[in-house]
Amino acid sequence: FLETDNEGNGILRRRDIKNALYGFDIPLTPREFEKLWASYDTEGKGHITYQEFLQKLGVNYSPAVHRPCAEDYFNFMGHFTKPQQLQEEMKELQQSTEKAVAARDKLVDCYQDISKAFTKIDKSKTNYISICKMQKVLEECGCSLTEGELTNLLNSWGVSRHDNSINYLDFLRAVENSKSTGAQPKEKEESMPINFATLNPQEVVRKIQEVVESSQLALSTAFSALDKEDTGFVKSTEFGQVLKDFCHKLTDNQYHYFLRKLRIHLTPYINWKYFLQNFSCFLEETAEEWAEKMPKGPPPTSPKAMASRDILARLHKAVTSHYHAITQEFENFDTMKTNTISREEFRAVCNRNVQILTDEQFDRLWNEMPVNAKGRLKYPDFLSRFSSERAATPTATGDSAAAQRGSSVPDVSEGIRSALSLPNQELRPGSKPQSHPCTAASTTAIPGTPPLQNCDPIESRLRKRIQGCWRQLLKECKEKDVARQGDISASEFLALVEKFNLDISKEECQQLIIKYDLKNNGKFAYCDFIQSCVLLLKAKESSLMQRMKIQNAHKMKDSGAETSSFYSALLRIQPKIVHCWRPMRRTFKSYDEAGTGLLSVADFRTVLRQYSINLSEEEFFHILEYYDKTLSSNISYNDFLRAFLQ
């Protein structure tokens, strides 16, 4: 919770729920959000208590479990309406600061003894000593510190640790520096940067004001470098990083305290221009008024940014539809076989296949491309990025793009690494291997299941090539499959792709390996792969006046939005589901041990993977959105199958 009421109970407002959904990439239309909020705030108070919120989620409130941890108290992002709580916050921060200063003074006094003890204990002359031994030495020298206190002190001095060991020379140097800093004349001390680690809470805002006033130009330059479109806004995380660069040893706790004092701790974007122009006249008594005058909201999308996204979308579409032609053009330019082409050669390819670009448009596009140190385009990386299922978007779109996306497909290279590293698992209790050709070899349920993959475009291209050689391919797979498990290693599959000249990229191979790693053991299920390419399943033919229907809403307890992405996904997977819905239903039931007709999202995803259903993560999200409207994390598998059998 972000606020407390007069009785000290945590409360949540409409914006808090919206921020939470935004943070977890759960997209809701305004109408959907109003329905959700109405179901929580049944009395129309404009807020609900933390206990009421947990009760709506079916969770019993326990003060011991659901209160903020004491050690994370200052990181708890929120402001407090009770003065007593604010005083406690300031008192705790001041105490931790005083402890750090006292520990530093002790170390300075015992510097010679500590130095001799370290030299004596370092018999191998590596200059490194473990944390435990360091604590013991400090205790013997009269400077007893807990591991937490020692760690905080090391972090404040910038002394790093390696394998739980410290370079004691760095430690001694840091102690010496702190000693010399305290002994400097007053005139020189004023020229040194302010050490924020030693400040108490009341001084933080005033000292930051001094830094901002003395470094206006440098701060403006730093913020401008982040705000390339000159919108006046930067992310709060970027804003904090700039402040920490200028405010020597400003801690996270102090930064969050500073934001709360300025009443901008709940703002995802901060207007840095307003901050620099008006922070010198900030007074704590008028903080609310000062914060209200600051422009709100995320930076508006500039026409240039929109144009860049449009060009990237066109480029993605061109590469997807003319992959081989564009690849051939790149290879024709690459006469030295370096897997790179020049800037002008890339521009010529874009002009022929995408659109004729102005100098400004091409400069912005070139900045998004994978370029080597010599300024040449690495076209294999380019093809890998722009031929994937996801449309490529510039990284600058950031949080808003993530919120609109809802659920994105993880990077394929990361997905394949996680898939290949998963250990073998035993069969889930109550589940049995299915003998039907469409099923997987076993019904394993593993936490962290690899992402779903829509390999339909890849498999469609492969069908023509495999039709003439599938028997020989199957024979070689069986020869490599000595244990007769129905799968081979990923490297063996890649070797066969080369041998049979299947003409698919490494990226596409990795997608197939993820999809057909049906046992989550890093192996490639070749039987299911060959069957999918040889057994050509077509959708049921229907007249022009007919189309696939989703079951009526009154037959379902709760149904969600019927989006175009939802329909296109169901239409594509319909032939596969119709072909093997009976064994699939048996597998669903084996996971549904209680016989409720419902499966968890994780189990539902696992079964779809076992039957090699061509769905991307985004399409899977749309299906969940329809069949789990109440966000119960349970799917009615009978409702799902019924959609394909009417």
Curated annotation (Swiss-Prot):
PROSITE patterns: EF_HAND_2. The modification Phosphoserine is found at residue 435. Residues 432-446 have a biased composition (Polar residues). SUPFAM superfamilies: EF-hand. Residues 448-646 are annotated as: Interaction with PARK7. It comes from the Eukaryota. Its main location: nucleus. InterPro entries: EF-hand-dom_pair (IPR011992), EF_hand_DJBP (IPR015070), EF_hand_dom (IPR002048), EFCB6 (IPR052603). Residues 552-646 are annotated as: Interaction with AR. Residues 1-27, 28-63, 109-144, 214-249, 321-356, 357-392, 468-503, 504-539, 579-614, 615-646 form the EF-hand domain. One of its GO terms (molecular function) is calcium ion binding. Signal peptide: none annotated. The keyword Transcription regulation applies. The modification Phosphothreonine is found at residues 29, 439, 449. One of its GO terms (biological process) is flagellated sperm motility. Keywords: Calcium, Cell projection, Cilium, Cytoplasm, Cytoskeleton, Flagellum, Nucleus, Phosphoprotein, Repeat, Repressor, Transcription, Transcription regulation. Microtubule inner protein component of sperm flagellar doublet microtubules. Binds PARK7. Part of a ternary complex containing PARK7, EFCAB6/DJBP and AR. Negatively regulates the androgen receptor by recruiting histone deacetylase complex, and protein DJ-1 antagonizes this inhibition by abrogation of this complex. Microtubule inner protein (MIP) part of the dynein-decorated doublet microtubules (DMTs) in cilia axoneme, which is required for motile cilia beating. PANTHER family: EF-HAND CALCIUM-BINDING DOMAIN-CONTAINING PROTEIN 6, EF-HAND CALCIUM-BINDING DOMAIN-CONTAINING PROTEIN 6-RELATED. This is EF-hand calcium-binding domain-containing protein 6.
